[in-house]
């Protein structure tokens, strides 16, 4: 009996000594550099230099915002005990603002009031990035001016570009050039197979559409402009041809989706636009998504927002239409989808006027050209390819 008690005491003391030893042992050594970049894909083990044990959850770190981040790891040490360690990292904005300006850059005499309004200058993270043009110039006087534009974000990242500004006289438009079209019949024969469908996107600019004729030509779907915003902060206007277009399309058995042309610069405004669209389409059957069409790149600087805010705007629109059980997609051209938009989780509608190929498999819809010619529409129309899902 006494011997048994003695053994228990010895065992208890051994466990206490072991636990103290474990606590004193520096089982985790963190990296010397506890930082990463904004939107960098990094897992928590990136910040561990040495671990005397097994990491239980090597999770992805949230790098969607800049600043200090408190993290915690859970691991099993070499003695089998589960331990936790807290530490702090910093997510940094290390990317300079983007300046896009042709060299030379040409404007028509008297047509631009502020040069900074028409030069693309923005930051990946910060709103209201500071852009400055140095050098003398006169937008109301014909001539050449050698200038430099500089930009700096709140993290101190800088960018600059030198360019020549050409202020020129307005020229009369020539009507001598012959308009070229992409014949829909040729396009259909070239690309139609069991993996895709061929369709059009249509707005008031196509005038009165004969949907029976375009359906007979092989069109299986249309993306219709439901409406758009008039300007930054402007009202929402229904496309004048929308009702006729959607009724004509549905009556002739075409699949229908819609798009909204937006000037939104906040999440609140984007959600409001999404609800407006839902109200306009709720009495119709949509087989295809609602697209968010934001393409105000020529005067992007006037919006005063960074790409992070712009992406939140698109995300808000798409998520809001989802709340009403519609699918939301993002429409944009190839350059902006690859360089500005970060919407990896969303379905995309690509505008890219090139030969269609299956390599571009990240896209659900592909607007292949804007000069289509088809029986049933006077003038040109955009032709699209839809992947069969």
PLM segments and residue spans:
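Gram-positive cell-envelope targeting signals
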Residues: 1-32, 66
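Substrate-binding cleft of extracellular glycoside hydrolase catalytic domains
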Residues: 192, 196-210, 215-217, 223-312, ...
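Solvent-exposed, low-complexity, repeat-rich "mucin-like" stalks and linkers
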Residues: 18-52, 95-127
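Catalytic domains of cell-wall/extracellular-matrix polysaccharide-remodeling enzymes
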Residues: 286-359
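Extracellular interdomain linker/stem segments of modular secreted and single-pass surface proteins
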Residues: 90-98, 166-175
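Functionally critical loop-and-helix segments that line ligand-binding/catalytic clefts
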Residues: 174-199, 343-389
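Serine/threonine-rich, repeat-prone extracellular segments and beta-strand-based repeat modules
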Residues: 46-85, 126-163
């Amino acid at each position: 009996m006494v011997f048994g008690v003695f053994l228990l005491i010895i065992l208890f003391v051994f466990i206490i000594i072991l636990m103290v030893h474990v606590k004193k042992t520096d089982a985790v050594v963190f990296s010397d550099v506890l930082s990463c970049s904004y939107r960098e894909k990094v897992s928590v083990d990136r910040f561990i230099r040495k671990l005397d044990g097994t990491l239980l959850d090597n999770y992805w770190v949230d790098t969607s915002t800049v600043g200090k981040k408190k993290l915690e790891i859970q691991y099993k040490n070499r003695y089998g005990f589960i331990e936790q360690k807290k530490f702090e990292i910093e997510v940094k904005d290390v990317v300079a603002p983007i300046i896009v300006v042709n060299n030379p850059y040409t404007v028509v005499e008297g047509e631009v009031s502020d040069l900074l309004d028409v030069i693309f200058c923005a930051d990946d993270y910060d709103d209201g990035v500071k852009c400055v043009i140095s050098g003398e110039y006169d937008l109301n006087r014909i001539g050449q001016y050698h200038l430099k534009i500089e930009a700096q974000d709140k993290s101190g990242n800088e960018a600059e570009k030198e360019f020549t500004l050409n202020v020129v006289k307005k020229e009369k438009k020539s009507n001598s050039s012959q308009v070229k079209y992409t014949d829909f019949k040729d396009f259909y024969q070239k690309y139609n197979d069991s993996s895709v469908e061929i369709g059009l996107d249509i707005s008031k600019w196509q005038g009165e559409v004969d949907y029976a004729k375009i359906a007979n030509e092989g069109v299986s779907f249309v993306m219709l402009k439901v409406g758009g915003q008039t300007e930054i902060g402007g009202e929402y206007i229904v496309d004048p041809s929308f009702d006729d277009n959607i009724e004509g399309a549905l009556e002739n058995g075409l699949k229908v989706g819609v798009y909204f042309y937006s000037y939104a610069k906040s999440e609140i405004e984007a959600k409001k636009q999404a609800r407006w669209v839902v109200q306009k389409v709720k009495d119709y059957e949509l087989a295809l998504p609602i697209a968010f069409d934001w393409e105000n790149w020529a005067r992007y600087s006037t919006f005063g927002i960074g790409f992070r805010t712009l992406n939140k705007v698109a995300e808000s629109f798409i998520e809001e239409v989802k709340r009403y059980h519609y699918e939301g997609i993002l429409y944009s051209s190839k350059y902006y989808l690859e360089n500005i938009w970060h919407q990896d989780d969303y379905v995309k509608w690509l505008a890219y006027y090139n030969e269609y190929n299956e390599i571009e498999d990240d896209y659900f819809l592909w607007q292949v050209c804007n000069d289509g010619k088809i029986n049933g529409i006077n003038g040109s129309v955009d032709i699209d390819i839809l992947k069969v899902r």
